[in-house]
């Protein structure tokens, strides 16, 4: 009798155990199905990413090139965005199988020199005449701001974050313009879009260029793309304190040590055309009112001494004040 009762009592226990095992099996199966779905989603995303990268790469294959290297160059009076993007985009083109070399129009400023030194990157060669060369423009699309001979150059591409300029070509070109804070941000996006790994040195100079052109993300032109680019590039570059890096490079931007008045006036100088009027403007920044006032006096004399060297109807010098990157005038 006791054995019979024991058998009867054990039946529910066996059923419970069976149900638990069955439920566990169902749960495992569902987990496996979910994991499989997740993997399929990841595989699809990776395939889509690879497809987009392949399509982006194919989009530049129709560049009409003449014999010789591609010179990647920015505007006259080169700032950090112009210098650093020329270097970074030339490296990108080389990684994509093209022969490219960065160039500048004239000597770089203290800030750009500081960024390149920190990254361990050499200053690009100066290009005296662009006539007849394969040219890829960065950070501008204006003949008035371009290197000498640009109107007779073979322009194959433009990467810019300004308005549409006067540069025109009869052949197909790579043209990319975005309304964001720095051309360097566009170049960063191109590395991602083309699936090219960003080396530490390139990440370092792109980081410096974005910080410079957006005034550490305080400029009105700053976008979410610029904000996302900074931590991404800083991690690769090994820059732990972005704000400290900006303060250091900004101090260099406000330094005119060892420069003549003519060099100061034309350090950040650009020319524009409005209708039939062509004018030029040199932009300067000072850290305080005393320095700004002294610079203003010097630039007034510099305009009188050197203004006639430029082929413009009007020429200006604008002296502003900035403290730790913040405009205070």
Sequence positions of predicted segments:
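Bacterial lipoprotein signal-peptidase II cleavage site
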Residues: 27-33
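Hydrophobic helical h-region of N-terminal Sec-dependent signal peptides
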Residues: 15-20
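Bacterial N-terminal signal peptides that target proteins for export
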Residues: 2-13
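C-terminal motif of bacterial Sec signal peptides marking the signal peptidase cleavage site
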Residues: 22-25
């Amino acid at each position: 009798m006791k054995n019979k009762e024991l058998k009867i009592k054990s039946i529910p226990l066996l059923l419970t155990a069976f149900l638990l095992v069955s439920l566990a099996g169902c749960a495992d199966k569902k987990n496996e199905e979910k994991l499989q779905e997740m993997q399929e989603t990841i595989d699809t995303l990776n395939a889509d990413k690879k497809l987009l990268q392949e399509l982006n790469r194919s989009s530049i294959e129709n560049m009409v090139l003449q014999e010789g290297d591609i010179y990647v160059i920015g505007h006259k009076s080169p700032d950090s965005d112009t210098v650093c993007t020329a270097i970074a985009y030339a490296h990108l083109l080389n990684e994509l199988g093209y022969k490219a070399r960065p160039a500048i129009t004239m000597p770089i400023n203290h800030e750009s020199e500081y960024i390149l030194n920190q990254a361990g990157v050499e200053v690009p060669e100066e290009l005296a005449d662009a006539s007849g060369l394969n040219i890829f423009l960065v950070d501008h699309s204006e003949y008035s701001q371009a290197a000498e001979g640009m109107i007779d150059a073979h322009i194959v591409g433009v990467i810019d974050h300004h308005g549409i300029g006067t540069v025109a070509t009869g052949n197909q070109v790579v043209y990319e313009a975005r309304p964001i804070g720095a051309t360097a941000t566009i170049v960063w996006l191109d590395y991602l879009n083309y699936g090219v790994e960003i080396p530490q040195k390139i990440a370092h100079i792109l980081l410096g260029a974005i910080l410079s052109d957006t005034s550490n993300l305080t400029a009105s032109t700053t976008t979410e793309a610029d904000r996302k680019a900074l931590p991404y590039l800083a991690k690769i570059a090994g820059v732990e304190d972005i704000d400290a890096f900006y303060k250091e490079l900004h101090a260099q931007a406000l330094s005119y040590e060892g420069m003549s008045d003519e060099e100061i006036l034309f350090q950040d100088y650009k020319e524009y055309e409005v209708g039939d009027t062509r004018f030029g403007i040199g932009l300067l920044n000072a850290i305080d009112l005393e320095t700004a006032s002294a610079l203003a006096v010097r630039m007034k004399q510099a305009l009188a001494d050197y203004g006639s060297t430029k082929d413009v109807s009007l020429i200006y010098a604008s002296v502003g004040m900035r403290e730790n990157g913040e405009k205070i005038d």
